[in-house]
Each structure stands twice: as structure tokens, then as C-alpha cells.
Amino acid sequence: MWTCLCQLCFYLLSTLAVAALSIAALVLYKTKPYPNIKRHKDEETFLDPHTIKTVTFPSLEDSPSLELSVIVPAYNEEQRLPSMLDECLAFLEQKSAGTPNFTYEVIVVSDGSQDATVSVALGYSKKHGAEKVRVLELIENRGKGGAVRMGMLSARGRNLLFADADGATKFPDYDKLEVALKQLAPEWRDDGIAIGSRAHLENDAIATRSFFRTILMHGFHFLVWLFAVRSIRDTQCGFKLFTRTTARKLFTSLHVERWAFDVELLYLAENLKLPMSEVAVRWTEIDGSKLTPFWSWLQMGRDLFMIWVRYLVGAWRIASIQKKEK
């Protein structure tokens, strides 16, 4: 009997080992090690509403010419975008008036929107000027991570913030992130990330969410910890501030373009040993979310596993390390 059990265990383990090796070989064969960042010609320019001319975006590889770039990824956000931009621009204008050397730009990235998102954003560009508000219109939907990346690659700031279009995070909390980032990285050439966090609100969220959604939330947090990021409690808050140097390293190495992109960014940051600070921010849930709890979190769980597997077997590599080695 014991002999049969041992043989059965041997066959099971052998089958699992063969399956694991097959998956690893398939992943290595079908996956490119570095991101292939393609950009349509029309995505290289923005419209200046005053001159009615198209202007070429700068590059993230250029030296900075502003203090702050705010990247706002937007997919079908004609309803929620105005209130977010109103709060954002009012805060930035007030900060600019009180601090003359504080200059900024807001880049709204329409991620293949089918509604009036582009028209709404262009209205703000016309009102405030293309020096302050620019609209990057992606030809096809890339996903939130892809939209953020395209905005980052087009930015002029010493520091770069991405902020969700729903306005769930109170924009004046930017000051908290700025203070935290300066402690990590006094200059834009230094590395650092200040990460807006809702972790302090978790108990309140549990009190108001259904039991099912609470289970999903804890399950997702566990998967993030297991497969990817262990030093940051809230990886998904859409309010993160990077130095220009750090943005170059991370967004040229990013593979995931959809919802789990935040996790890969922070996974990369941990592996590159970049300084990070998690900062509590004010956050309110806004109606109109594009996420459907079960299916979106199932997709993110799959993405987390694939992030882990691909880096583990060497199918994905970090582009910034490749550049350094050259």
C-alpha cells in the first residue's frame, strides 16, 4: 500500500513539474522581455485650441521645463472629468499664484473614449491655454496603464503625478505627496515615489461594503502581497507622484497596460530598490466606476500571477537595468 502511495505521489509531482516547466517554456517563447512601446503618429501631437494647430509633444527623455506634470487618464469620462479638473486647476492656480516658481501642466489622456471626453478636455485647454492643459487622444483603448504611460512619456515636469479622472482623491492632498517626495528625493534627478494611500480608511470600507466585496478586497490584497508588492499596503490608489528620473525608469519598463499596472510599477520599484513613501490621502468613492468587482478582480488576480511568473522565469526583464548595463 505504501509503495502504491509513494508511486502515486511521485507521478503527481512529476506531472506538476512537467506542467510547470511547460508553462515556463511557453511563457518564455511567447513573451518579449522588454515592452514594445508603439505610438501612432497622431498620438505624438496635441491640438492648441487657440491657434488651431497641432504641436508635437516633448519627450520624457528631455530635460524638465516645469515643476509638475499631472497625468489624468480618462476613458468615457465626460460626466466625471469636469469636477475633477475644476478642483485640480483651482488648486494648481492658487499654488502657482502663491509660489511664482511653481509651474505646471495637466495632460488629459483620452484612452480611446467614445463619448465627449476629448471635447470636454479641449474646453479646459481653450480656457486655460495649451501651455497649462493639453489633451492626448489615443487612437485605440490601451487600458489605464497604457494611458498613464503615454501621458508620462509626453510630460515636461520635474515631478509627475497621475491622478484618476473621477476626482475620488482630494487634489489638495498633493501637498502631502510633495512633502514626502522631497524628503526622499530633493532633486528631480534623484529617485523617489510618493504613493497616495487609502489604507487608513480600510476599517470604514469594511463597515460599508458587502461581505462578498470585503472578501474580494482581502483576497486581492493577499495576492498582491504573495506575488508582487510587500512594502506598500494600498497599491491601487490613483494618486502617485514620481520624480522625472524614476518615471523614466518605471514607465519604459512597464509591461501591464490595464488595471494591474500599479502593482507592476511598485513591483519594479521594489526590485530596483527605489525609495517609496506611502501617504494617507482623503478619498471618497465616486459613482460610475468602470470596475465590476468580481470579474475585474479576477482579471487582476490573473495578471498578478502572470507578473510574478514572467519575472520569475526571466520572460520579462527591466528595461532600465538593460540601459544601465549598456
From Swiss-Prot:
Stored CDD domains: DPG_synthase
Bilayer topology: Single-pass membrane protein
Q: The organism sits in which domain of life?
A: Eukaryota
Entry annotated with the keyword Cytoplasm: no
Q: Where are the transmembrane segments?
A: 8-28
Q: Which UniProt keywords apply?
A: Endoplasmic reticulum, Glycosyltransferase, Membrane, Signal-anchor, Transferase, Transmembrane, Transmembrane helix
The answer to whether the entry has keyword Membrane is yes
Query: One GO MF term, please?
Result: dolichyl-phosphate beta-glucosyltransferase activity
Give me the reactions it catalyses.
a di-trans,poly-cis-dolichyl phosphate + UDP-alpha-D-glucose = a di-trans,poly-cis-dolichyl beta-D-glucosyl phosphate + UDP
SUPFAM superfamilies attached to this UniProt entry: Nucleotide-diphospho-sugar transferases
Knocked-out gene: effects: Larval lethality. Embryos lacking maternal and zygotic wol activity show segmentation, dorso-ventral patterning and gastrulation defects. As a result, germband elongation does not proceed normally and mesoderm invagination is disturbed. In these embryos, protein glycosylation is reduced by 25 percent, the ER tubules are smooth and the unfolded protein response (UPR), a transcriptional response which up-regulates genes that enable cells to cope with misfolded, endoplasmic reticulum-retained proteins, is activated.
Matches recorded under InterPro entries = DPG_synthase, Glyco_trans_2-like, Nucleotide-diphossugar_trans
Q: Name one Pfam family in it.
A: Glycos_transf_2
Q: In which pathway does it act?
A: Protein modification; protein glycosylation
Record's GO cellular component terms: endoplasmic reticulum; endoplasmic reticulum membrane
Q: Which residues lie on this side of the membrane: Cytoplasmic?
A: 29-326
| Residues on Lumenal side | 1-7
Q: Where in the cell is it found?
A: Endoplasmic reticulum membrane
- What more is known? 'Wollknaeuel' means 'ball of wool' in German.
What this chain does, per the entry, is described as: Required for normal production of N-glycosylated proteins in the endoplasmic reticulum (ER). Required for embryonic segmentation, dorsal-ventral patterning and gastrulation. Required for chitin orientation and shaping of the apical and lateral plasma membranes of epidermal cells during cuticle differentiation. Also required for correctly shaping apical membrane topology of the epithelia of other organs such as the midgut and the hindgut.
Family that this chain belongs to = Belongs to the glycosyltransferase 2 family.
This chain's protein is named Dolichyl-phosphate beta-glucosyltransferase
Q: Which organism is it from?
A: Drosophila melanogaster (Fruit fly)
